């Protein structure tokens, strides 16, 4: 769900009388997403208060609020399969961008602080890190007794990568020269 360059450019250039940007940390574990939905409900309330304080049209406020409430709660019975599927597949954070006639979400691999901003354009600065920095790294762990290649992603434990013909220890990796501890 990380936005593509064209999506990012559309967000960057979008303007409206009232654009709502919401960021919230989320959990990958399905049992904990109920807490995330509660946070979204609170952020929705804050967004509505900011929209009303900014003098937004009542219909625009209702449109934005309806989309946010539906995302947090699902349909009237609370069992919309698409919403349940959405919450079952989260990343580290969720970015939501809403304005009259527009609503989009992006699941992000980096952890962001909960916030709401209402302006004449979307607040995308927190989103930029997700599209700017790589979220994986390779580590060559070299010791006297072992050599390992590890892949580290944005979440979860490092994973050892098996490489054929990788030296077995520091002595082999140094070209059979003396290795001091």
What are these regions (language model features)?
Residues 1-130:
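Non-catalytic, solvent-exposed interaction/assembly segments
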Residues 133-158:
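Gly/Thr-rich phosphate-binding beta-strand-loop-beta motif of the actin/hexokinase/Hsp70
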Residues 120, 125, 158-181:
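Long, charge-dense
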